[in-house]
A protein has these predicted regions:
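Active-site-lining helix/loop region of Rossmann-like oxidoreductase modules
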Residues: 50-153
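Rossmann-fold NAD(P)-binding glycine/threonine-rich loop
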Residues: 1-47
Length: 153
């Protein structure tokens, strides 16, 4: 509701990636949606560097996904296979892997921890929290809010 009106198919559970693919009439690979802009701009690292973060890619064509996963690697992130487009809900806003600046192992675990149907409520709670802060949150504060939504200590 932050930007777009409701779309019936999405409200009924269709993944955004499948909906977009159907609308444009072409297959897609979903990637880079689960990292913040500052992460993309500032946190890419060489392969093997300590602290290298990960980004997930989901899609139905293994060949196309392999190309995108190479791009993720070239951008300075460890690529993680996020499954098919049907499974791409696991990297939507409000899921455990979304905008948390995780390394490869943490990203793989977070993708598996996603619970069907839970993300919209978590996403809305995160957005509500961030919109009611006294000042714009820093990159690190956004990461902490996203992580905290799933890992209460």
């Amino acid at each position: 509701d932050l930007r777009d009106s409701h779309i019936k198919e999405l409200d009924e559970g269709k993944t955004e990636s499948l909906w977009v693919s159907g609308k444009i009439g072409h297959p897609i690979i979903k990637a880079f949606n689960n990292v913040l802009g500052d992460t993309l701009a500032e946190k890419g690292r060489k392969k093997g560097d300590e602290g290298r973060l990960a980004a997930a890619a989901a899609g139905d064509s293994a060949e196309d996904k392999a190309v995108v996963m190479r791009l993720i690697d070239e951008a300075g992130f460890d690529p993680v296979d996020g499954g098919t487009l049907e499974e791409s809900w696991r990297q939507q806003p409000g899921t455990p892997c979304y905008c948390c600046d995780y390394n490869k192992e943490e990203m793989e675990k977070a993708l598996q921890e996603a619970v069907p149907g839970k993300a919209p409520g978590v996403r809305d709670a995160i957005n509500d929290h961030l919109m009611h802060l006294a000042k714009a949150p820093t990159h690190e504060e956004i990461i902490q809010v996203n992580r905290g939504a799933h890992h209460k200590e």
